[in-house]
């Protein structure tokens, strides 16, 4: 189990040193045949779990993700933070506790989720259009869209996504 972004390698484990390794999850001694090393700590395979879905990370893959004190499986990391963990508008990191807006798989800070034309913030319940990577409020959607020459990729009422499990 390797934490992406972590360059540390686990220290060698031998039969003589294994008896005193403690699990970072439960604090118990690790006497199992297999143990995991993630986030500079050793874990029982049953103790290294996703903070959201509680899946045992050793059983579902070879990597885990950490952010804001949470240990996450790949699916929950992408669901909560998008592929990059950064706002699609400003590029800045989004804290795990912050509410976000989403459009077509992109994640935005609330303050960055604005109309590309008038720069007014789009709020829950507003109708918007996502066209070629840009957000438009109902008033400022391109004339071609109104005339039916373009298809709106997103024109549903907007609901915020909360970064909690």
From Swiss-Prot:
CDD domains in the record: LIM1_LMO4, LIM2_LMO4
Pfam families: LIM (PF00412)
Keyword presence, Mitochondrion: no
SUPFAM superfamilies: Glucocorticoid receptor-like (DNA-binding domain) (SSF57716)
Purpose: Acts as a positive cofactor of GATA transcription factors to establish the identity of the ventral mesoderm during gastrulation. Down-regulation in the dorsal mesoderm is necessary for the proper formation of this territory since, when present, lmo4 may bind ldb1 and restrict the availability of this cofactor for Spemman organizer transcription factors. At neurula stages, suppresses primary neuron differentiation and modulates gene expression at the Isthmic Organizer of the midbrain-hindbrain boundary.
Domain named LIM zinc-binding: residues: 21-83, 85-147
GO molecular-function term, one example from the UniProt record: transcription coregulator activity
UniProt source species: Xenopus tropicalis (Western clawed frog)
Name this protein carries in UniProt: LIM domain transcription factor LMO4.2
InterPro entries found in the cross-reference section: LMO_RBTN_TF, Znf_LIM
A biological-process GO annotation: nervous system development
Keyword flag rRNA processing: no
Keywords, in A-Z order: Developmental protein, Differentiation, Gastrulation, LIM domain, Metal-binding, Neurogenesis, Repeat, Transcription, Transcription regulation, Zinc
């Amino acid at each position: 189990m390797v934490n992406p972004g972590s360059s540390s390698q686990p220290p060698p484990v031998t039969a003589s040193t294994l008896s005193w390794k403690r699990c970072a999850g439960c604090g118990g001694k690790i006497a199992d045949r297999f143990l995991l090393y993630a986030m500079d700590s050793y874990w029982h395979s049953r103790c290294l779990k996703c903070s959201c879905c509680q899946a045992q990370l050793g059983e579902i893959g070879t990597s885990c993700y950490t952010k804001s004190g949470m240990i996450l499986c790949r699916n929950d990391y992408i669901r909560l933070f998008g592929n990059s963990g950064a706002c699609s508008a400003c590029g800045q990191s989004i804290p795990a506790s912050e509410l976000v807006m989403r459009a077509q798989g992109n994640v935005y800070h609330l303050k960055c989720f604005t109309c590309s034309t008038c720069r007014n913030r789009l709020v829950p319940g507003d109708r918007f259009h996502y066209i070629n990577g840009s957000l438009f409020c109902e008033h400022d959607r391109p004339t071609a869209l109104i005339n039916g020459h373009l298809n709106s990729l997103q024109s549903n009422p907007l609901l915020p996504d909360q970064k909690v499990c």
